[in-house]
Amino acid sequence: MERNELVNFVEGILKRIGFRTMKLEFRGGCFDLVATRQLLLLFIKALANIDKFSEEQAEDLKKLAKLFKASPLLVGLRSKNAELEDGVVYERFGIYAITPGTLYSMFAEGEPPLIIAERGGFYVRIDGKKLKALREEHGYSITELAGILGISRKSLQRYEKGESVVSLEVALRLEEVFDEPLVKPIDVLRARLKDVTLTSEPDNILEKEVFEKLRKLGMSVVKIKTAPFNAITKEEEDDIELLTGIDERKTGRTLKRAELVSQMAEVVGSDGVFVVKKARMEVVRNVPILPKKLLEEIKDADELLELIRDLKFKS
């Protein structure tokens, strides 16, 4: 299955299970699909080979997920070494990766994955508190239970503290010993975004000038390299995000990017704006295109947001 076929296949799954979707046709983008259902928002990258996912794409995807309180996911079919298996969670640069089958099972059948692939094989996460309670209830010392399992005391202590994943073999032995389920499902929707840095390093002089002006207006700016927009501009007081594009001049590519920004803004409940060095003011699919000179005359964030709203309303 080629990448475009995979994107369409994944989108079909999401639509069947009640998601509203937007497909991003942008070469090299950090995501291919935005999907929303009730309060859940997903940014999904679909790749036949998940090893083609770059670290730069991963960093941008994590930034977007943190800014929009979304879940980032990589959906694929294989790695460079093997086919991906249903029910198993893989990981690339801190982004969980699953198969289309696992995606369907999670949402349509309520069956979250239980197994995580790490270097050396397949592992599970177990309920450490429950394990300790069962061990004490059955009268086993740490040394005795470790001996039964064929592992070290230190390993068992780490399992009870939830500090380590457990091999499938050991997990099965534990459940046989206690006749109780101990394996915890893996919540692939809960991404580890706490340490994600929301940087704003510009790629060129024009970006630098626009970013500096936006910050002077009282807005924060987060640089995104692998999307149809250049940055997310955030107005903190009212919690408003702007998908912000920047170009030297208006071209066909600018208009295509503006259309994609319009579609994404609608799905995520945001607004879009483009700042172009050489252009006249106009609106493309609800996305205002502002001459850079006009931006320079704006005095604060409220004035910019009001201008965007007025231009959208009049278009």
UniProtKB/Swiss-Prot annotation:
DNA-binding region: 142-161
CDD domains (UniProt xref): HTH_XRE
SUPFAM superfamilies referenced in this protein's UniProt entry, alphabetically: lambda repressor-like DNA-binding domains
Annotated S-S bridges: none
Transcription recorded as keyword: yes
Residues covered by the HTH cro/C1-type domain: 131-189
Gene Ontology molecular function terms on file: DNA binding; DNA-binding transcription factor activity
Keywords of this entry: DNA-binding, Transcription, Transcription regulation
Pfam families, per database record: HTH_3
Heme listed as a keyword: no
Record-linked HAMAP family: HTH_type_cro_C1 (MF_00584)
Protein name: Putative HTH-type transcriptional regulatory protein PH1808
Species the sequence originates in: Pyrococcus horikoshii (strain ATCC 700860 / DSM 12428 / JCM 9974 / NBRC 100139 / OT-3)
